[in-house]
């Protein structure tokens, strides 16, 4: 797909405008806003300039090939075909950069992991996933903060929520939402039989200017004692907070030691969940006419299987199978899966744009 000249000129012009305004800006908020846009536009403008120059050079070389000087024409011919061979790669890279952006891709995110079918083993697997994403976040240079956790009786988590902050968190992790399935022999299994368990992962964007008004009149707040693994009460005061959003039925529980902190945390998670619900509804509306989507986008869709006996991880949406289970679950090898999903999404969206063109 060829990037149109008008679109390239538009990108370069906008970058020049932002750069000029950044040099003259005095307001701190405006500087922050312009700096962010400048950082986003710079690689696109550089690629656009490189492509523009390559196209112009190709036209010049084509003229030189028609010239009277045979030696110069031959040199021009060699350069022309070498550049012509490189041009599709530049065009493709530029087309990817010009794809419409998901406005939430640059946002921070909350990750919620819930043990599904499989009892204790599902909770242990939820704990494995938590460790995998925490390590991945560390490798990406993101910050990770545990927000709330309900521990499993034999390790892992029944449910756990963490906040991840950094550059492009949601854009990289958004395809992790869905049902993750594990096949392995649990530590508690004496017969050596393979069990299948599952955990659900939800990645929820947290834009800085989250556009959600939470009417506390719609929220029922209950306080109770925080409980640890096995259900035992870990303190003697009613510090745990459960918030129920009555219109949607969404429930959030936070059970750290401070009730005040739990209230603030629960509100934050509730807002993220409501925003995510709004976003999912909008996506579902577009899904009917939209091509180029990775999987169904449904949170109940089984997206990936981790098969321990075979050392295999399979992502069912893109037919990807890797025999690198230990490396992936450790977090170190997860980026290969993430990058494959992003590349597949970009290819599908490019194909959809070409179909519409």
UniProtKB/Swiss-Prot annotation:
Assigned keywords, A-Z: Cytoplasm, Methylation, Protein biosynthesis
Purpose: Peptide chain release factor 1 directs the termination of translation in response to the peptide chain termination codons UAG and UAA.
Domain of life: Bacteria
Name assigned to this protein: Peptide chain release factor 1
Residues bearing the modification N5-methylglutamine: 232
HAMAP family, per the entry: Rel_fac_1
UniProt keyword annotation of Flavoprotein present: no
